[in-house]
Amino acid sequence: LINKYGSVRGERGLPKLLPGLNFIAGLNGETESSYQMNLDLLHEIRREGLLLRRINIRQVEGEGFQDIPQKAFNMFKTNVRDTIDGPLLEELFPLGEELSDVHWETHDGRTRLTAHLDETHTSESCRGKAGITFGRQIGAYPILIGVEYHIPLETQSSVIVTGHGARSITGVETGLQAEKVSQKQLEAIPGIGEKTAWKLISQRAKRKRKNPGQEAFDSAEEWFKATSIDWSEDYSLYFDHQ
């Protein structure tokens, strides 16, 4: 019932409400077969087409608890991450899905530092420069989102999902402007890459030198065609519609 109604995507691009599961290893009475039973349960959930927002696997240790069979525990954890978590992540955050209201937290690492409050990290001047920006949507157990260029911290924006990690996803912002987008921003768009991005930036610079004070191109599509680069409708997901 929760999946029936909770799997509907809301305004921010996420399913509205999904359950999570916690597996605790080391409880009294547990045996090695317990891990296989837990894995069988997860596979049954997936065969039924049900979604889970998260799966936590924890170890309980200390006086009064039994020893954990490490080999069985590690195999269970690896199986869950490889056969359950990966496919779930791709289904929850499919390629091309737009996620809105992402809050940008850190540059070039997942740990929030005092330095990240400096103007060098929060001002608009850092946008599009080389590096990685990490952010999340507000909520319980928000997915970590990485973007392969700098975005001013303490800001929010929308992204298109472009890839999946083990426990995170990558994305590229929407609303990129052909007049301002940097080479690093272009490189982050699937299907473009470093060489094509350099050609586009060079063509824009030439056009601006030829027509100073004017916009180089009326649209991203015109820009690509003027650079002899095939335009894909997929690119329109990322660019501002002028």
Question: Model features per residue range: what roles?
Answer:
Residues 50, 56-67, 72-93, 97:
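Catalytic cores of secreted or luminal carbohydrate-active enzymes
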